[in-house]
Structures are given as structure tokens and as C-alpha cells.
Amino acid sequence: MPGHRSKSEKKDADKQLRRDPYEVLGVLRNSTDQEIKSAYRKLALKYHPDKTANDPVAADMFKEVTFSYNILSDPEKRRQFDSAGFEAVEAESQELELDLSSLGAVNTVFAALFSKLGVPIKTSVSATILEEALNGRVSVDPLVLGQAVSKKVEKQCAHFYAVTISEEEVSAGLVCRVESSSKSKFKLLYFDQEANSGLSLALQEDSKRTGKITSAGMYFLGFPVYRLDHTINSMAQAKDPETAFFKKLDGFQQCEVTELKAGTHVFAVYGDNFFKNVSYTIQVLCAAAFTQEKEDLRSVEAQILTKRAELAKFETEYREVLVQFTDMTSRYAQEMQSIDELLKQRNEIHSAYTTIPLMKRSSSKNRMRKSSFKKAAAKAPAPTEQEEEEEEEEEEEEESSRQKNKKPSTCDKSETLKKKSKWFNLHLKLDKKKPC
């Protein structure tokens, strides 16, 4: 009868059964981020639990596809895997992308609670929305270039917009921005048009909080532009705030698409709140009137790239200095303790150069004096009667001499005056008729 396997044995077995993430997604090792993302979405849509509810094999495939994508979509984890395989990747810390539309009420509450506490939770677009878009069963509203539209979309639902651009507008550049004054969470999506009139998800930008609003944008300006994935820094912040500083720019990656072709393009706003609907404003602009802003963006992103390289070098220097500082701090404490011990030994040696016993406290000295005085008095012989009489006579003579030398005080003077005034203040009755 086979025994039960421990958790560690099961974990080792799972590691042995893992397939190469590139093999799982069907991509090459030099594939671009866009190719990896497209392959993942097709497989995730194929094996999603909403479509294969009673198929355990499909459920396992969906987990494997999601796990592989979580490695290859993260630049740092992909680099670690390419260099050292699964052992270099912290498998237990891989976050799964949650499809909130497939969660029950209880799980949604827990996910919202963890998100409120600062735990980074990745969410994905509902598989139902992606399937409907791929089959061309979504309603697409026209959007005029340069005109802002404000609406409200339900959670885990999407509003689709189509905008048509010319060759001149393509060369000038195009910008699509979405803002939410209610600080709602949403995703800005861009779809490629398939041959069967269907729409396949090509680009996705999660909203981020900027000041008093949340916003997301896509910039097609004809030159490389970059996006900042805040999730990488959030995960690093949760693990180690110090490391988070050095990983702050790890999510600064180049966007897959830098320009669009002339024609009609489809964008969508996906509600990503846990419970509430999302209020938003979407606007697609031609960048012809923003020449200076284009140059400023190109310049500042070049500086950020330089700073990212400098930050990696600075981290190495910082770690080396930190080790030295830790060593110096430890040595400081050891040297201080050693010096105190040596000075203490020196004082003890100095104190040893004497034949006099150590001094005791004053209170003990007084007690010793009193006890020795009592002992001496007890041992002395008792005085004779003649000696006692002589002592009494000497005491009387001393007392009389003190009384003579003592000056009268103010109280004594007042007493004598009172005694004298008693004689002169006698009330005598005299008869004036009789002569004295």
C-alpha cells in the first residue's frame, strides 16, 4: 500500500512536471513582449474556465498557461528564468491574473479587501468580453477625433469606440487618453481587426492614480515611447521597501506599438472596479498641435532610461557600502567593549597597589564608632562617691559662671519693666479735703 506523499514531495513532483514557459505558450526565446502577450491571450481564451467548466484537463492547461505568462511577462522574472531556470524564480510568489467576472461574491470581497490593504492584485479582462469581441458580437460607437466623450460603464464590462485617422494624422501622431474623476479602476484596450471582422486584444493599459484622478493613455507618436508597470514595484515594496527603490524603474519598458496606420482603429474602456460602475472620459487626439510636448516626452524618457542604468550601478555600489557599514558598526561596538574592559582591568591593577583595606561607607563607620565607644564605656571602672561630688561641684560652678556672663534678653527686660510699673500704677484714693 503506497504511503501518502508529503507537501515537499508533491512540490518537487510539480517542479519536475513543469514545462518550459516558452514551450507552453508556443513562442521562441527571442519573442517580443507583444508576441508573448498575443499567444497567452489566445490560449487563455481557449482554456478559460468559463468555456470549459467541467474539463479538468483544460483547467490545468489554463493554470499552466497563466503561470508561464506570469514569468515571461515580467522582465525581471524572464531574465531570471533565462539565466537559471525555475530555481531562480520564486514560484510561490507568482501572482495570477484574476478574472473578477468569474469570482463569486465572497471571493470578490476578499480580493477587494486584500487590494485595499495594499496587496498587488492583477486583474484580467473578462474572457466573455474577449470572446464576444473576437466573434464580432460587440457594439462599437464612432468617436470623433479631438472630441471628449464621458460615460459610465458597468464593472467587468466594456465600451468600444472606433476612430478613423488619415495619413497626415498618422505622421503627426495619435494619443488616446482616458480619465476618471471618481478615481475608478479601469483598463484602456486597443484591438486589432481580424479578417472575419472580429477584434483581438492587442494592447492593454491599466489605470493609475495621478493626483486626484485615475488615468491611462496610449501614445502612438512615431518614435519609441515607454510604459511604466507599477505592479513590479508594488510587489517589491511588499517584500522589501529598500529593494523597491532600486526596482522602481524595472517596469519602465518600451511599448510594443509606436505608430498606427491610416484607417479605422478600435479602443475600449473596461470597468475594473470590484463593485461599482466606472465613470470615465475618453478622448483621441492628433498630436500635430503638441510638437513641444512630443520633444519633451522624448527627452524625459531618454533621461529615465539613463537613470535606470545608473540605478543598477548604484545598487551594486550601495550594497557594497552597506556591507562595509554593517561591518564597521559591528567593529565599533566590539572596540568600545574591548576598551572598556581594558580600562576596567587597569583600574583594578591600580587599586591592588595598597596595604590599606578598602574604605567602607560612612554609615558603617559611624556604627563602628558607636559600638566601640559603648564597649570602652562598659570596660571602664565605675567612679567613686568623692569623684562624683567633685564633678557635681564643677558643674554647679560652670552653671553659675554662665548665668553671670549671660546678657539679659529683650524678654527679660520687658518682664522687669512690668514688675516696676506695677508699683507706680497703683490706683490710690486720696481725700483732697484732708491734708497730707
From Swiss-Prot:
Species of origin reads Arabidopsis thaliana
InterPro entries listed in its UniProt record: DnaJ_domain, DnaJ_domain_CS, J_dom_sf, Plant_DnaJ_domain
Q: Which residues form a coiled coil?
A: 291-348
Asked whether the keyword Secreted is assigned, the reply is no
Classification via SUPFAM superfamilies: Chaperone J-domain (SSF46565)
Primary place of residence?
membrane
Indicate what this protein is called per its UniProt record.
Chaperone protein dnaJ 16
Give the family from UniProt: Belongs to the DnaJ family. B/II subfamily.
**Where located?**
Membrane
One GO biological process term is: response to abscisic acid
Q: Where is the composition biased (Acidic residues)?
A: 385-399
Task: List each copy of the J domain by range.
Answer: 20-85
Function of the molecule = Plays a continuous role in plant development probably in the structural organization of compartments. Seems to not be involved in gravitropism signaling pathway.
Gene encoding this chain? ATJ16
| Positions of region (Disordered) | 360-416
Which keywords appear in this protein's UniProt record, sorted alphabetically?
Chaperone, Coiled coil, Membrane
Concerning Gene3D superfamilies, the annotation shows: DnaJ domain
- What GO terms fall under cellular component here? membrane
- Quote any Pfam family the record assigns: DnaJ
In which tissues is this gene expressed? Expressed constitutively in seedlings, roots, leaves, stems, flowers and siliques.
Specify residue ranges for compositional bias: Basic residues: 362-377
Q: Does the keyword Chaperone apply?
A: yes
Q: Topology versus the membrane, per the UniProt entry?
A: Peripheral membrane protein
